[in-house]
Amino acid sequence: MSNVKKIKGFADLFSPESDVFTFMENTARDVFSSYGYGELRTPILERTELFCRSIGTETDVVQKEMYTFPDRKNRSLTMRPEATAGVMRAYIEGSLHSQEQVSKLFTFGPMFRYERPQKGRMRQFHQINCECLGPQEPYADAEIILMLLMFLKRIGLSGLELQINSLGCRECRPQYHAALRAFLASLDTAELCEDCRRRMETNPLRVLDCKVPRCKELTADAPVILDHTCDACSEHHSVVLGMLERAGVVYTANPRLVRGLDYYNRTTFEVVCGEIGAQSSVAGGGRYDGLVSQLGGPDVPGIGFACGMERLALALEQKAQREVPRPDFLVAVLEQDGLERGMMLAEALRESGLKGEVSFAARSMKSQMRQAGKRNVRKVLLLGGSEIADGTVTVKDMDTGGQTTISLDAAPGAVAD
């Protein structure tokens, strides 16, 4: 019988890779809570209709990438391809709009898209999401971007590029659509990819999001959306940029930045890291003022972002800026009658706030020192025959090679030093 194997595009996360994910989540909790955000956990499974109505039926996500299936009552369900739609559903269903004027929420968890697996892009991937619902003022846009940048700085990333654009609103965007359609009609459309030819009719803005090199080349001179935004949208964008400049943030204006989901309006942004290759976007988001009402809720504006955790981990690996935490100790028991004492010593060390392991069987010094080196521990506490007889322990510093024999009571202080 053949071995059971994981599904293509899905990964097992072992330590230390999983430790990096935990580090990012804990850092995110610390940063986001300082801005007044609270954690929300939403289901992985949602009704397919939710994503069709929010993301847009003409997007690649809905057309090609969703894991969708009928349940036993023939209801169409989908494994979430992104988090915002589920947060909006929870916001509406939980009547959060009636409880507070501004709701600030963050989520962690796996998302699912049927794409070609490659470095930084898996079929199951993990995201950190933030959503701010209620304020329509541009200061909310600036704050959430500043919060994102603070989070990225706290996890050890620097030298990233913030790209920003405005997509206008439902009043002024039709004018841009008309100008864009006229431009696209002037091209030799036979040279565009099949998806772009379809998008020309259904949602021309999606053409600007195409990654096919020839399509990007043909649309290089497409009309710029900021030349077609209304006065209100232009003022909104100007205030956002002004706030970022006053905060000392360097950004790049990217008129082609439309994002891959239909619900965005006005501010859109991405953070890119060129060092991780083709999948260079590590975070992105924007404003979605009509999304809540589109899903049957009140007319509540909102803005949010998502970070791809696999891509963040890749960026951290490339920049090598994060030091992986080392275990404080390994209690190495060399004699069988020292196992109970070793267990109690390890518990005392953990009670004092230290982290480490204890051997469950008496093994040779060579074997346990090899384990200590593999674990990259700071100190090894040796319990051999003489230590067991004397009620002492020998502490070996793995960095300097020095060692000293002390009483068991003094062990926590010696390991902490």
From Swiss-Prot:
- Reaction(s) catalyzed by this protein? tRNA(His) + L-histidine + ATP = L-histidyl-tRNA(His) + AMP + diphosphate + H(+)
Query: Keyword GTP-binding: yes or no?
Result: no
PROSITE patterns from the xrefs? AA_TRNA_LIGASE_II
Chief location category:
cytoplasm
**InterPro entries for the chain:** aa-tRNA-synth_II, aa-tRNA-synth_II/BPL/LPL, Anticodon-bd, Anticodon-bd_dom_sf, His-tRNA-ligase, HisRS-like_core, HisRS/HisZ, HisRS_anticodon
Q: Which domain of life is it from?
A: Bacteria
**One MF term in the entry's GO annotations:** histidine-tRNA ligase activity
Keyword field:
Aminoacyl-tRNA synthetase, ATP-binding, Cytoplasm, Ligase, Nucleotide-binding, Protein biosynthesis
Specify the enzyme's EC class, one word.
Answer: ligase
GO CC field: cytoplasm
Q: Which GO terms describe its biological process?
A: histidyl-tRNA aminoacylation
- Pfam assignment, any one: HGTP_anticodon
What Enzyme Commission number(s) does the record list for this chain?
A: 6.1.1.21
Where is this protein found?
Answer: Cytoplasm
Spell out the SUPFAM superfamilies in the cross-references. Answer: Class II aaRS ABD-related (SSF52954), Class II aaRS and biotin synthetases (SSF55681)
Matches recorded under Gene3D superfamilies? Anticodon-binding domain, Bira Bifunctional Protein, Domain 2
Family to which this protein belongs: Belongs to the class-II aminoacyl-tRNA synthetase family.
Q: How does it assemble?
A: Homodimer.
What protein name is recorded for this chain? Histidine--tRNA ligase
Species, as recorded: Oleidesulfovibrio alaskensis (strain ATCC BAA-1058 / DSM 17464 / G20) (Desulfovibrio alaskensis)
